[in-house]
């Protein structure tokens, strides 16, 4: 819809408002401004405004002026543009129309069909409409200004005698438009003369001509739903039906009709007759109740001044600018809002009112962050902490040289056919048959794709959701419950990881090198862990589904300091060890929960002992099932508080004795307040003798 800036300035106060500011504000408020052109001869700007389907009230000059008045908090220049005028009308003999909401008729006699005044000619020319005469120009002017339909008929062609308003009536009739026998349209008649089928066409035989000196002015508002239904039945759309569907607000009808009669009577030097009309009752005024807290929580804090919410006074003022009728209940801290008639099509829910408040106040004046509910503050705070931890994990892995991968959560098949996989019934595609239970499987597929492209070395990680069934749930025949988890997984393969010297050939990544990278990642993340050897992944609650993917001789379970399983690290089952591939996978939630940030407040400061220490190196031959941790715990079980440290300095295995291995331990003894005496040394030697005898072959 095109608009004239000069015309708008005569309706709403736009002094000291630049046109560029007007365009920006309208665009931010949801009304896109396009096709701006300047008419230098008349010092005017013509621009096109597009709006949404639920804001038909904007598609006329008064409607846009009313919206600009709310946006800029400027007054409309005449009360006529705010409120409907009160006209003394007589009732027409029309009852229960299905097509009409309003109908007004007035007879005008002794009319002179003069040329339109220059100001009217200019306004029409702004819309590329050629001015002809008053009878043609004024209905077009009224439609552009108010969005209301006005029709003018030659009174003498309707009746040669004075108009009797009781003869106006509505009748349902078929065969009116293009021979439609099964479709009845409501037709406005005067006695036996058909004036027009409501909303579709006009009787050409009663139109005005050059000899017209007595006219019938008719204004009407159609039921848009009726017009839409008839258009669908007829499969036909006419120029008049389109205008009726795009008609402006019903509340502006009387103002538009009064102005059209006034202009025709004034410039045509005519005598006006009495006003007759038919008006359906308006729907009950819509009332919405909105809590003040709801408005503040949804909109959030404002940028201007201190970071506070909109006050009750500010909200009240904004609602009044929108021509709403607000009432604030201080006891309930809520607003009771009466919605004006011309906004009842698009203001239906409380959220619509809140959006209007934000639009008028300015979306850019609010802080761009999620609203905080006092009940959920703690959860939102925890979510932010979790997100920050995930960001740090990504950062640390990138620093170690790993690239992030993204895969979707489906398999086209599961290579190991494990019972704990979740199968999709009736999948949309073949490659969406299973939900993934591990990130590592997709990373191995990524590696295979890279190998086919000639990329031997790949170091990637992925963070995503996995879906699996607990192995314990398989014992039941009832419906199995699926579970969703957030995991972190990585894959490392590097054939040129290091070389001892420049003259040596490159060496591939070893198990210990890969383990060192994982340890460095955990150290930087500040997660204390314990590495545990595992012989069968059925013992694992988290990673039992990787049993066929990893080499059990090169696989370790990673636990936190409470010995809870949080991750796994191992070597893939490759046929060749030339370029070994290693993977790790963590339960991300448990990994983050295991982070123990270093805090100097929690540190215990002790001075170094100035007394000499005693060192004992021992060599033990133990069974393969006996771990180093168990041996250390056995030494500490002697409850000797002089033990300062226990370190492994050697490890070897005799191939002739497969069931045992040898380990060298260095135990350091020291007292913090004295020098060790003979009694201390004798106790230490006795404990070592007992230990050697215990692990003696």
UniProtKB/Swiss-Prot annotation:
GO biological process: phenylalanyl-tRNA aminoacylation
EC number annotated for this UniProt entry: 6.1.1.20
GO MF: ATP binding; magnesium ion binding; phenylalanine-tRNA ligase activity; RNA binding
Binding site for Mg(2+): 346, 352, 355-356
Residue stretches making up the FDX-ACB domain: 609-697
Magnesium keyword on record: yes
Cellular component, GO annotation: chloroplast; phenylalanine-tRNA ligase complex
Essential cofactor(s): Mg(2+)
Keywords on record: Aminoacyl-tRNA synthetase, ATP-binding, Chloroplast, Ligase, Magnesium, Metal-binding, Nucleotide-binding, Plastid, Protein biosynthesis
Family as reported in the entry's similarity comment: Belongs to the phenylalanyl-tRNA synthetase beta subunit family. Type 1 subfamily.
Subunit structure: Tetramer of two alpha and two beta subunits.
Name assigned to this protein: Phenylalanine--tRNA ligase beta subunit, chloroplastic
Organism of this sequence: Gracilaria tenuistipitata var. liui (Red alga)
Gene name of the record: pheT
